[in-house]
């Protein structure tokens, strides 16, 4: 029937482009949109299309591709012809070949996440594009509120390496305190900075009214004496702070005479210990380092745009040229937590298993879940330098990852919630199934059916198994269902796939005996565990990404004796 043929074509295309599941509404829209003469018969046609979609969705992704190749090979030819032009990054303003210097400045107080990765990848890719230099600068000068921890220095370097980012230089801000002191003293001598000993609430009251603090215009000698007292320990934490002189009428009160250095008693810093008690705040240390390290271009989240306003005062006072700043919006994944403070709290409360809990959006969590570094990079380059915030759905990231893992992931059968099936009248048979349908050179896996021994099918497929119905056991044979209960009784019908295809019998996967397997599925804030059986001889290794046919792509998390534990990535 013509309608069935058209519907099959569009259902297969839609399924292949959406991880193996066709959307009935999309297929109906496509069929009627491109064949307007059928609209008058919509009432009769829609049930036919829905039935075709249901049949297509019962096939594995590989079977869908094979079927589309059979009925509409032009789809693959067209795809090959216009193999998507890789989206690249736009040119960088004021960039000269060989002279671009970028930096990524994470705070090592937690593992870094997809949002942070945007600045890291953009900084690295642009430095590479222009044959320049990429610096990793640890912003670790807050030993009080955002305390750095040794483990996170290592994690960040590991995560960057996994993303393919190799810094040309690694700088630790906490190793450079003497340098910051030198510039602070110069600014005090120039009359561009001063030591304020006002109570914080008193200073805020004056600042908000645009009134100078009483210490602002005191002589340089008095300021230097106070500065020495800060360094010598004569002031306690909270009693004195170095401020940069700015415009007291600036529309943003936070810019007015902003704090540059403050005292931290007993900092107990992981690198500097208690050697120093005067610590620079982010905007001061960052401004000095960007100049000292020769940074030419800064990639900064739009929400931090005001940092540039503050830092420009220092550049103006010293007569330096401020780096070109490229602002971009925040990047987040729908329904996935990226906040370091919320993640830390969840870990401390036992809600999350660690910084690589697969429910999180940290780089290590995405890696553990089976997302490839190339997928993260492609997503970030695709989003590019947009100033608006971007929230991507998990489906967006999964679609990019799917096309990357599909060619490399070997195929196996995993039967969730196994139910035994006895097949009467079937001969002994060894099913030889390709490890990958597109790569015969990888070899085959063998599953043996032995008469008198049960095989196992998934409880998920019980709705398809009604007494008197027929199904095809994938790569094995066709059976008629006789009885459905705690075990399923069936009888052998035939070997030929063509018979099942012509009769439109559903296809299900199976295993003879298998090894125990658990698949952990992140679902919102929950972790769902599906227990079942994996092919007994499945040669999988921890860290490998494979496809469990008709289930989805998974990453093998660990192997505990016979048991395999995998984490679900996506369809």
UniProtKB/Swiss-Prot annotation:
It is found in: Cytoplasm. Keywords: Aminoacyl-tRNA synthetase, ATP-binding, Cytoplasm, Ligase, Nucleotide-binding, Protein biosynthesis. A motif ('HIGH' region) lies at residues 106-116. It catalyses: tRNA(Glu) + L-glutamate + ATP = L-glutamyl-tRNA(Glu) + AMP + diphosphate. GO terms for molecular function: ATP binding; glutamate-tRNA ligase activity. PANTHER family: GLUTAMATE--TRNA LIGASE, GLUTAMINE-TRNA LIGASE. NCBIfam families: gltX_arch, PRK04156.1. This is Glutamate--tRNA ligase.
């Amino acid at each position: 029937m013509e309608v069935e043929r058209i519907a099959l074509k569009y259902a297969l295309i839609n399924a292949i482009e959406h991880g193996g599941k066709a959307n009935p509404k999309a297929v109906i829209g496509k069929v009627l949109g491109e064949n307007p003469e059928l609209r008058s018969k919509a009432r009769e046609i829609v049930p036919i299309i829905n039935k075709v979609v249901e049949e297509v969705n019962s096939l594995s992704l590989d079977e869908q591709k094979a079927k589309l190749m059979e009925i509409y090979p032009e789809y693959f030819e067209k795809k090959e012809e216009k193999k998507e032009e890789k989206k690249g990054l736009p040119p960088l303003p004021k960039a000269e070949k060989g002279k671009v210097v970028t930096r990524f400045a994470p705070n090592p107080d937690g593992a870094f996440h997809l949002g942070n990765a945007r600045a890291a990848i953009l900084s690295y890719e642009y430095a590479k594009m222009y044959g320049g230099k990429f610096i990793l600068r640890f912003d670790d000068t807050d030993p009080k509120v955002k305390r750095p921890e040794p483990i996170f220095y290592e994690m960040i370097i590991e995560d960057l390496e996994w993303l393919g980012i190799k810094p040309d230089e690694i700088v630790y801000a906490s190793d450079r305190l003497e340098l910051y002191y030198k510039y602070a003293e110069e600014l005090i001598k120039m009359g561009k900075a001063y030591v304020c000993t006002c109570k914080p609430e008193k200073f805020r009251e004056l600042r908000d009214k645009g009134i100078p603090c009483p210490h602002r215009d005191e002589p340089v000698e008095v300021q230097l004496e106070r500065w020495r007292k800060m360094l010598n320990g004569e002031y306690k934490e909270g009693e004195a702070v170095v401020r940069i002189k700015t415009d007291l009428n600036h529309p943003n009160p936070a810019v007015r005479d902003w704090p540059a250095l403050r005292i931290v008693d007993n900092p107990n810093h992981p690198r500097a210990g208690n050697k120093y008690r005067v610590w620079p705040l982010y905007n001061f240390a960052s401004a000095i380092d960007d100049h000292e390290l020769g940074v030419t271009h800064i990639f900064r989240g739009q929400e931090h745009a005001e940092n540039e306003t503050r830092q420009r005062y220092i550049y103006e006072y010293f007569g330096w040229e401020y780096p070109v700043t490229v602002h971009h919006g925040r990047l987040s994944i729908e329904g996935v937590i990226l906040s370091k403070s919320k993640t830390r709290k969840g870990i401390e409360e036992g809600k999350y298993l660690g910084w690589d809990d697969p429910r999180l959006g940290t780089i290590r969590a995405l890696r553990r879940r089976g997302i490839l570094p190339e997928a993260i990079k492609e997503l970030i380059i695709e989003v590019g330098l947009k100033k608006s915030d971007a929230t991507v759905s998990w489906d967006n990231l999964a679609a990019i990852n799917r096309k990357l893992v599909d060619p490399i992931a070997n195929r196996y059968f995993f039967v969730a919630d196994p139910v035994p099936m006895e097949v009467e009248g079937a001969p002994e048979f060894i099913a030889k199934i390709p490890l990958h349908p597109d790569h015969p050179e990888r070899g085959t896996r063998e599953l043996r059916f032995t008469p008198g021994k049960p095989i196992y099918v998934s409880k998920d497929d019980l709705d398809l198994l009604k007494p008197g119905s027929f199904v095809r056991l994938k790569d094995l044979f066709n059976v008629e269902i006789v009885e459905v209960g705690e075990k399923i009784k069936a009888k052998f019908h035939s070997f030929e796939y063509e018979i099942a295809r012509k009769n439109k019998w559903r296809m299900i996967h199976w295993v003879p005996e298998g090894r125990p397997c658990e698949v952990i599925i992140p679902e919102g804030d929950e972790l769902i565990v599906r227990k079942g059986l994996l092919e007994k001889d499945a040669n999988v290794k921890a860290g490998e990404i494979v496809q469990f046919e008709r289930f989805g792509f998974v990453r093998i998390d660990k192997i505990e004796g016979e048991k395999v534990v995998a984490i679900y990535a996506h369809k």
